[in-house]
Amino acid sequence: MSVGRRRVKLLGILMMANVFIYLIVEVSKNSSQDKNGKGGVIIPKEKFWKPPSTPRAYWNREQEKLNRWYNPILNRVANQTGELATSPNTSHLSYCEPDSTVMTAVTDFNNLPDRFKDFLLYLRCRNYSLLIDQPKKCAKKPFLLLAIKSLIPHFARRQAIRESWGRETNVGNQTVVRVFLLGKTPPEDNHPDLSDMLKFESDKHQDILMWNYRDTFFNLSLKEVLFLRWVSTSCPDAEFVFKGDDDVFVNTHHILNYLNSLSKSKAKDLFIGDVIHNAGPHRDKKLKYYIPEVFYTGVYPPYAGGGGFLYSGPLALRLYSATSRVHLYPIDDVYTGMCLQKLGLVPEKHKGFRTFDIEEKNKKNICSYIDLMLVHSRKPQEMIDIWSQLQSPNLKC
């Protein structure tokens, strides 16, 4: 190779080396410039996310504290900012006394209806003992557990259910068992002392569950929690649960046929009923479901009307776990919807649940009940009559 060609080759190599060094220097300069400059990597000057502002309504405010406590990320942020230095009040898990702090924490507390004052004072209380238990009720794994909300004076309703749709049966390997859910009805609520009659009833039928708490409309959510606790300890192997009121008619045979048709995947998270969407609290003080703005604001999650709903046994256990992460709410079906929301589930609407009754013209037509699962409401004698007609071998629809 000639000297001239070697010089040209060497010059080319030196030029390429210079270009490479130039590129390295330029990249280094750009990376050392202000990251917030045009075209550069943007570094936020402050936190890009802030915890939501503190709600004004008492329930929302207390629930937000609970949400942060059970969320590891939010809990860490709250502790760093000093917003949540200690755990939430967990007295509802052990010790129960009136919570006098609500008198100052809830705006205009003294002007609230008495039922709301009582609810707020005992909002955190859940540790109520069983006065009447049925520890052997689920000795044989139930296929379907019927749980009926009732009050002590409703003897006729309970007996009508026993003689109709609530009969305990054992067909093949499928067992249907029944319990009635009761609390105490003290004299201050204008109830007579019916304890002797209740004891006789319980001894005879072995289907009463009764807890040591005041049985009121606003305490139905408490009844729900106590029942789910009982399921988790005394009936954890039930495959399915129907829970409803004592003034509904239930086509138990249709429910059993439906349950037997389900796939395993469908049955796992089953929760069906007459589902209500995009509802909110009533603000009319004259209404039974009145909720003041100082207590709760916002839209309710989807929920199944409290007349009755059907769900899987495994889901009942998960629901009980969720109840510890949701403060009690005065309306029990809404509360159940809140617990489902915690589990990431939405109740499914089923046309067989008619919690607002059927058309007047169809009430006397027994064929109208063939494909129904539940209809609200019916008197005790009507329950017996409808059930008897549905069992008739001569029924043709």
UniProtKB/Swiss-Prot annotation:
The chain crosses the membrane at residues 8-28. GO terms for cellular component: Golgi membrane. It holds the Pfam family Galactosyl_T. It is a single-pass type II membrane protein. It comes from Mus musculus (Mouse). GO terms for molecular function: N-acetyllactosaminide beta-1,3-N-acetylglucosaminyltransferase activity. The lineage of its organism: Eukaryota, Metazoa, Chordata, Craniata, Vertebrata. Interacts with B3GNT8; this interaction greatly increases B3GNT2 catalytic activity, independently of B3GNT8 enzymatic activity. Pathway: Protein modification; protein glycosylation. This is N-acetyllactosaminide beta-1,3-N-acetylglucosaminyltransferase 2. Residues 1-7 are cytoplasmic. Residues 29-325 are lumenal. GO terms for biological process: axon guidance; cellular response to leukemia inhibitory factor; poly-N-acetyllactosamine biosynthetic process; protein glycosylation; sensory perception of smell. Its cofactor is Mn(2+).
